[in-house]
UniProtKB/Swiss-Prot annotation:
<dbReference type="InterPro" id="IPR003700">
    <property type="entry name" value="Pantoate_hydroxy_MeTrfase"/>
</dbReference>
<comment type="similarity">
    <text>Belongs to the PanB family.</text>
</comment>
<comment type="subunit">
    <text>Homodecamer; pentamer of dimers.</text>
</comment>
<keyword id="KW-0808">Transferase</keyword>
<dbReference type="GO" id="GO:0015940">
    <property type="term" value="P:pantothenate biosynthetic process"/>
</dbReference>
<feature type="binding site">
    <location>
        <position position="73"/>
    </location>
    <ligand>
        <name>Mg(2+)</name>
    </ligand>
</feature>
<keyword id="KW-0566">Pantothenate biosynthesis</keyword>
<dbReference type="GO" id="GO:0003864">
    <property type="term" value="F:3-methyl-2-oxobutanoate hydroxymethyltransferase activity"/>
</dbReference>
<feature type="binding site">
    <location>
        <begin position="73"/>
        <end position="74"/>
    </location>
    <ligand>
        <name>3-methyl-2-oxobutanoate</name>
    </ligand>
</feature>
<dbReference type="InterPro" id="IPR015813">
    <property type="entry name" value="Pyrv/PenolPyrv_kinase-like_dom"/>
</dbReference>
<dbReference type="InterPro" id="IPR040442">
    <property type="entry name" value="Pyrv_kinase-like_dom_sf"/>
</dbReference>
<keyword id="KW-0963">Cytoplasm</keyword>
<dbReference type="Pfam" id="PF02548">
    <property type="entry name" value="Pantoate_transf"/>
</dbReference>
<feature type="binding site">
    <location>
        <position position="142"/>
    </location>
    <ligand>
        <name>3-methyl-2-oxobutanoate</name>
    </ligand>
</feature>
<feature type="active site" description="Proton acceptor">
    <location>
        <position position="210"/>
    </location>
</feature>
<dbReference type="GO" id="GO:0005737">
    <property type="term" value="C:cytoplasm"/>
</dbReference>
<feature type="region of interest" description="Disordered">
    <location>
        <begin position="1"/>
        <end position="29"/>
    </location>
</feature>
């Protein structure tokens, strides 16, 4: 069967016809569709994906030309302060999805199905996914797991809901996997490939490969006709995703080996807050130009 693809007009060039522009200056662009991502794979063009949990980052990333935004269950750590992704709920994620869809004018917004909201049955998965689509305005959903969840993916796709798969290291199952361990090595390579094929056959439009050996990721990417999205899976995947707080340096603690920091936003905010505090205490703010007669 084929993935659930949208039926908008063909767009040339980058997905949705978007262009990179400074924040606040980008023209309105057409919505990125799942088939645009497939076209990029067919042309051999890599594409980026970032997480987003609010309207401001969604708008900034959208205008920077990021074609896919993931409202991940990583909000558990990065918004709500939980130690793992396990505690976050559907009720906590839906408002974040709603905010991101308001901020993103052209990016495809994917909502994570959190732990406990889909595993029991395809019917449970469908009910949860429908909530994210109707209440959150998501354009697609993501769920973790391989062959045991192919039926869940098929049920969603048959209902018209695009699905992104997620295999390799799956954070919701970290206790079963024995902690954060690289997947797809040795005998696991065939298991990983079988999971990827099952998700594709069920209709997934893409599959995330997390903390997977580069060789296994290269093999899976070559075997699949749908895009692979790597996070700690080497350079051969069709796309790459990072958690935005890691990418931008908001997380000042230790990060995973696969993370590259492109900014020191945490330090910038800390310095701005300190300067504000110093000016308030010293009487420099508010100045006359910040006051009314």
């Amino acid at each position: 069967m084929t993935a659930a693809h949208d039926r908008s007009e063909n767009q040339p060039g980058r997905p949705g016809g978007e262009t990179t522009a400074p924040y606040g200056s980008a023209p309105r662009r057409r919505r990125v569709r799942t088939r645009h991502l497939l076209e990029l794979k067919q042309r051999g063009e890599a594409w980026p994906m970032l997480t987003s949990y609010d309207m401001y980052t969604a708008r900034i990333f959208d205008e920077a030309g990021i074609p896919v935004l993931l409202v991940g269950d990583s909000a558990a750590n990065n918004v709500y302060g939980y130690d793992t992704t396990v505690p976050v709920t559907v009720e906590e994620l839906i408002p974040l999805v709603r905010a991101v869809t308001r901020g993103a004018r052209s990016a495809l917004v994917v909502a994570d199905l959190p732990f406990g909201s889909y595993e029991a049955s395809p019917e449970q998965a469908l009910a949860t996914a429908v909530r994210f689509m109707k209440e959150g305005g998501a354009h697609a959903v993501k769920l973790e797991g391989g062959r045991p969840f192919a039926r869940h993916v098929e049920a969603l796709v048959n209902a018209g809901i695009p699905v992104m798969g997620h295999i390799g290291f799956t954070p919701q199952s970290e206790h079963t996997l024995g902690g954060y361990r690289v997947q797809g090595r040795g005998e696991q390579a065939e298991e990983l490939a079988a999971d990827a094929r099952a998700l594709q056959d069920a209709g997934a439009f893409a599959v995330v490969l997390e903390m997977v050996s580069s060789d296994s990721a290269k093999r899976v990417t070559a075997e699949l006709t749908i895009p692979t999205v790597g996070i700690g899976a080497g350079p051969e995947c069709d796309a790459q995703v990072l958690v935005w707080t890691d990418m931008a340096g908001m997380n000042t603690g230790r990060t995973a080996r696969f993370v590259k920091r492109y900014a020191d936003l945490g330090g910038t905010l800390a310095r701005a807050a300190q300067e504000f505090a110093d000016e308030v205490r010293g009487g420099a703010f508010p100045a006359p130009e910040h006051s009314f007669e």
